[in-house]
Amino acid sequence: MLYYINKILSNNKVQAVILGIIGFAIVTVLTSYNIDDPSFNSVTTEYPSNLVGVFGSYLSDFLYQFFGLAAFIIPLACFVWSRNCWYGRYRGSFIRIFVMLLALISSSTLLSKIKLEFIPANAGGAVGIIASNFFERFTNQLYLLLIFFTFIILVVLLEIKFTSLSNFIIKLGKFLIYRVQSFLHNIFSQLSSVRLFPTKNNDKINITSSYQKPVSEKVKFTEEAKPVPANPIKFFSKPPAVPKISQSEIAELPPISLLRDPENHNVKGASSSELKQKAEELLTVLNDFGVKGHIININQGPVVTQYEFEPAAGTKTSRVVGLSDDIARSLSALSTRIAVIPGKNVLGIELPNKQREFFCLKELIETPEYQDKSTLLPLVLGKDLAGKPLIADLAKMPHLLVAGTTGSGKSVGINAMIVSLLYRYTPEECRFIMIDPKMLELSAYDGIPHLLTPVVTEPSKAVVALKWAVKEMENRYRMMSNIGVKNIAGYNAKILEAVKENRVIERSIQTGFDPETGKPIYETVTMNMEKLPYIVVIVDEMADLMLVAGKDIEMLIQRLAQMARAAGIHIIMATQRPSVDVITGVIKANFPSRISFKVTSKIDSRTILGEQGSEQLLGMGDMLFMGNTSKISRVHGPFVNEAEIEKITEYLKETGTPEYISAVTEQPEEDDSSIDIGDGTSDEVLYKKAVQIVRDERKSSISYIQRSLRIGYNKAANLVEKMEKEGIVSPPNHTGKREILLPER
């Protein structure tokens, strides 16, 4: 019974509720105090008027006698501690009590000179009188120090971040300076437009009756800022791609305290003698199967130990690799992975440790490798065989393909990648499009300010979202082309440089020709002076989308994977079914960086990585990572639980609100392209196209229609049967051929 009580009380949510109730009870006791109620100093036969009864009357009298009005610091501290416990921001009990006592003594001393009638002692209580008499022996100016000391204690008690306060003051000052500059600029611009004397040159305004296609564009920088036109020329008719979030609504980076601390499991690695004994057993097993050689090095990691085996001359690598199952059986190991170590004349034989070391995400985020600013989009993958942190840069990959069966740790790995980006970038710097057809894994992130749209769960909307990403990519390339840069980093650097120098970027666009002189007419357009954020598209289950709209998804992902890197758009695509109909050759060719968790067969491992080995992994975050250099590394992923993700998302939702773009998932009216998603409209469009093909090409075979429309065999057969019912083609004859009944055009 005591075990379950301790387990319940150890829950941070339960502790938060208990502290909140205690604080509310103390506030009720203090506010309903009556000097005539029974207490330590008075006796009465009447029932106390205190809302908590006799206990409340005695407790309130005790608190007012000792601390005076400073007693209200006690419930305030309870409320602050309750909030910290709820969000997992723990501090030691000694520090909590010590800070509260300092605040009580300081406040009581400051209030000791105030006399009040409704409390038994003065406003500072007995503690205030004693402390005040003690301090007055030295100097009266000590009260100034007490005021400052009380302020510091209250700031620590309320956990007000000085960095957040200073950043707010700096942002407020910049905002006020900007407003004053804009006001003065508008006044001087209006005064300059009033001409006291006529000028010699008359101003001419050329107006064209219709918009003509621009012939050439020129970019220039102006030293003086000009007001942006009300309706600037846009690259396409849709609303701006990624709206700027106001500074007041930018969500702060989540504190590291939201992640749980590393747990000390007292996992002891094998001793050197044990490793040597295991190496001798391994050599004995290899000799039994006719493989000669010797072990030259042993690398002990957190999960597996790698034995570098140098085979004898003339031994084929495939012969040793094929013995992985036999070695695991002979050594009573869960699994054995054998692979060539790049750059060495040895084979790496990886055997699992007796005790597995578990590590959390917090210890990897605190490493210098993650804090390195040269890594633009850091993804925390885990630790390698030597126990060193492995932080990959998504900007250099530039896209990532993830595969793994259920229970292999794929979802935890994706969560670790997302959290690592959330701890680096604010919503102004990085945005997400999350596609989750299973409506399970990514739903926890719904509502965070980093999202461009709510988590997409419908396959039809997923196709529209990918189309929007393609159009956004093309729009960004036009914007980068206008100022002469090649990638998003150069674009943002140029925009930032122009903003610091208080200038705007303008471009001259030729809109037509003067009908009288024949000279070109130019219009000056001010470009949008906002930095472009990174956009990360996360697709949790690719197989579901490929089953519904395979060709459309494949073409859109191919276009994004080929071109979106320079535009700052990156894709993380995951699937639990790494078969050839999901991970097609087109997708593999455009995703050089891949991660494979544990899979069921060697075929699946070859599909995702091009070689076997993933089927020998241990699961629970054990993965093989292939970077864009085609070098495969074994990595052990960190563990991040649902409670940590919930704390992070709740914090982000409280500090910022998302600004969704409806165009991401809305099918535009002018888009006539049909998507085969199984509804009646797309079937009708396909049928009309099939009839047109039969009429024009005079061919009615199912295979020909299948190739022409790029659809499945069953769909093509249904279309031909429908044409047969409507009298467009005849039934098949004894050879299977059909006669076309439609007249030729």
Curated annotation (Swiss-Prot):
Residues 387-606 form the FtsK domain. Gene3D superfamilies: 3.30.980.40, P-loop containing nucleotide triphosphate hydrolases, Winged helix-like DNA-binding domain superfamily/Winged helix DNA-binding domain. Coiled coil: none annotated. It is found in: Cell inner membrane. It is a multi-pass membrane protein. GO terms for cellular component: plasma membrane. SUPFAM superfamilies: P-loop containing nucleoside triphosphate hydrolases (SSF52540), Winged helix' DNA-binding domain (SSF46785). Essential cell division protein that coordinates cell division and chromosome segregation. The N-terminus is involved in assembly of the cell-division machinery. The C-terminus functions as a DNA motor that moves dsDNA in an ATP-dependent manner towards the dif recombination site, which is located within the replication terminus region. Translocation stops specifically at Xer-dif sites, where FtsK interacts with the Xer recombinase, allowing activation of chromosome unlinking by recombination. FtsK orienting polar sequences (KOPS) guide the direction of DNA translocation. Belongs to the FtsK/SpoIIIE/SftA family. This is DNA translocase FtsK. It comes from Rickettsia felis (strain ATCC VR-1525 / URRWXCal2). The lineage of its organism: Bacteria, Pseudomonadati, Pseudomonadota, Alphaproteobacteria, Rickettsiales.
